[in-house]
Amino acid sequence: MIRGRKRDGTVHARPDVCLSSMDDFFLRKPPAMDESPRLRPLSRAEARNLDLRAVRELGLPTLVLMENAGRSAARWFLEDWLSQGKGNLTDHKVLILCGPGSNGGDGGVMARWLDLAGVLVRVAWVSGPVPRLPAGDAAIQRDALAKAGFDQQDWVLPEDNAKLAKSLSWCTWVVDALLGTGLTRPIDGAFRTAVEMINDSGKPVYALDLPSGLDADTGEPLGVALRATATATFVAPKLACQYKEAEEYLGEVAVLPIGLPYALLEDYIEED
């Protein structure tokens, strides 16, 4: 019997979910990379183009891709990180920092899966210095979490830096779903301060797609970048992953599938 958490943080038995293994929880394990085509590192533009092709050529809604990404990220996080060492999943408190774009939406999906596994989750939708709520698919994720009663907050930096500091003291892990691969300009101002606060906290960071602030093409920090313990990058490695200088920001990297078929991937298969 799975043990989960109520919204007040107390642990309770969940008789409606009886699981013999994590495989049962996720129904079917996503294919390991050694069982799937090995793809060469992709540029920021190539990764974006793959998503667009999935929508235009296959008719896949972007919300489906987001759901698949968040689910894959939650699985690796639960199996290879939260389940390691002593203690139970319910001993962890995970702070998921979401930006207003699709990377934040991936974090919103991940929050639901972690909650289902019994992990205590706090979600913060972060913007600043001008307030900006999530749009599109990310807004759908935010609304779903709100209706499900999640511990969910809207932060505008730098005004809410104190909330960030308090949550960093509270959590055992930080999930970085702030900026993803689309960033092209240096991080400055309020977001730079936030990145520095997270790095200085010493809390392990699990980054979605790429650590916030790391240039997807060059592997260099755009002013400043989060130093992740682990990075879950989707579909294929990004160009940044091939540079030794980026290792201190990436941590351990896993390439996770989001359900794109071979027909879309064959042009990017790495040659022997």
From Swiss-Prot:
Give binding positions for K(+).
103, 176, 212
Top-rank lineage group of the source organism = Bacteria
The gene name reads nnrE
- Enumerate the Pfam families for this protein: YjeF_N
List UniProt keywords, sorted A-Z. Answer: Isomerase, Metal-binding, NAD, NADP, Nucleotide-binding, Potassium
Question: PROSITE patterns from the xrefs?
Answer: YJEF_N (PS51385)
Question: Which reaction(s) does the protein catalyse, per the Swiss-Prot or TrEMBL entry?
Answer: (6R)-NADHX = (6S)-NADHX; (6R)-NADPHX = (6S)-NADPHX
Q: Which family does it belong to?
A: Belongs to the NnrE/AIBP family.
Report whether DNA damage shows up as a keyword of the record.
Answer: no
Entry cofactors: K(+)
Q: How is the cofactor bound?
A: Binds 1 potassium ion per subunit.
Domain named YjeF N-terminal: residues: 47-266
What SUPFAM superfamilies has UniProt attached to this entry?
YjeF N-terminal domain-like
- Its Enzyme Commission number(s) read 5.1.99.6
Sites where the protein binds (6S)-NADPHX: 102-106, 180-186, 209
Please give the Gene Ontology molecular function terms for this protein.
metal ion binding; NAD(P)HX epimerase activity; nucleotide binding
Is this entry keyworded Metal-binding? Answer: yes
What protein is this chain from? NAD(P)H-hydrate epimerase
Which species is this record about?
Answer: Isosphaera pallida (strain ATCC 43644 / DSM 9630 / IS1B)
Described purpose of this protein according to its UniProt entry? Catalyzes the epimerization of the S- and R-forms of NAD(P)HX, a damaged form of NAD(P)H that is a result of enzymatic or heat-dependent hydration. This is a prerequisite for the S-specific NAD(P)H-hydrate dehydratase to allow the repair of both epimers of NAD(P)HX.
